Amino acid sequence: MQHKVVSIGDIKVANNLPFVLFGGMNVLESRDLAMRICEHYVTVTQKLDIPYVFKASFDKANRSSIHSYRGPGLDEGMKIFQELKETFGVKIITDVHEPSQAQPVSEVVDVIQLPAFLARQTDLVEAMAKTGAVINVKKPQFVSPGQMGNIVEKFKEGGNDQVILCDRGSNFGYDNLVVDMLGFHVMMQASEGAPVIFDVTHSLQCRDPFGAASGGRRGQVAELARAGMAVGLAGLFLEAHPDPDHARCDGPSALPLAKLEPFLAQIKAIDSLVKSFPELDTSK
């Protein structure tokens, strides 16, 4: 299989290259917390020599409850991202929810993300494609891996082939997700070798069927991440928090920030081992 390389500045993302970490926090809770979390990620990834892109949302437009915290909004969010870039020299990824957000966001961040719930919205796809930015597409929980090729094709028709695909689990009955390890390879095939990354923390969400917030299983984040990265992927998508029990969004699935270094050391060891093997075609 041919492996497409997507460049985020000097960072190369491909399924056969050393993995890239897309990591940070779920939503911007405050400027100071974003600075603290980003600094820790930068320190750890530099120590372990892992290519790194900071992740956070400026607006969580798809919260379960109308009363849930959404974030600081577009203007304040872009100010925080700009300060993070100037202070730490990081690349940044964030999600957009409306076509009108695509251009102003692309002027600040390096990768714009198409949320899973919106991945088939053609107007949003077209607006994102027109920016020319690198795109990260979250696979909807209700879409099969093979169907992701159609979304990539929409971006190509819009003039943008700089697309990364991200798996964040698939519906498994009601209120539960499961990760299909075979699906990673299917996504690569369907997209003609596009980089595929794994959102491990969102894949650990589980819902109270009558509740107003997502639960999670952060006690299993290491096991699931090790399994996924053993497939041989372009990157890992991860959220961490210094106090997950009091995070304002998705704390139950967030990695405790203090565990970041030992966690990433394991992931890098697995990624390096898997990619040291020659590719093995067992189809014939």
Swiss-Prot record:
Main location: cytoplasm
Enzyme class: transferase
Catalysed reaction, written as an equation: D-arabinose 5-phosphate + phosphoenolpyruvate + H2O = 3-deoxy-alpha-D-manno-2-octulosonate-8-phosphate + phosphate
Entries under SUPFAM superfamilies matching the protein: Aldolase
Superkingdom as given in the UniProt entry: Bacteria
Protein name according to UniProt: 2-dehydro-3-deoxyphosphooctonate aldolase
Molecular function in Gene Ontology: 3-deoxy-8-phosphooctulonate synthase activity
GO cellular component terms listed in the entry, alphabetical order: cytoplasm
Metabolic or biological pathway: Carbohydrate biosynthesis; 3-deoxy-D-manno-octulosonate biosynthesis; 3-deoxy-D-manno-octulosonate from D-ribulose 5-phosphate: step 2/3; Bacterial outer membrane biogenesis; lipopolysaccharide biosynthesis
InterPro entries: Aldolase_TIM, DAHP1/KDSA, KDO8P_synthase
Compartment annotation: Cytoplasm
GO biological process entries: keto-3-deoxy-D-manno-octulosonic acid biosynthetic process
Species assigned in the record: Proteus mirabilis (strain HI4320)
Keyword field: Cytoplasm, Lipopolysaccharide biosynthesis, Transferase
PANTHER family named among the record's database cross-references: PHOSPHO-2-DEHYDRO-3-DEOXYHEPTONATE ALDOLASE
Keyword Cytoplasm: yes
Keyword Isomerase attached: no
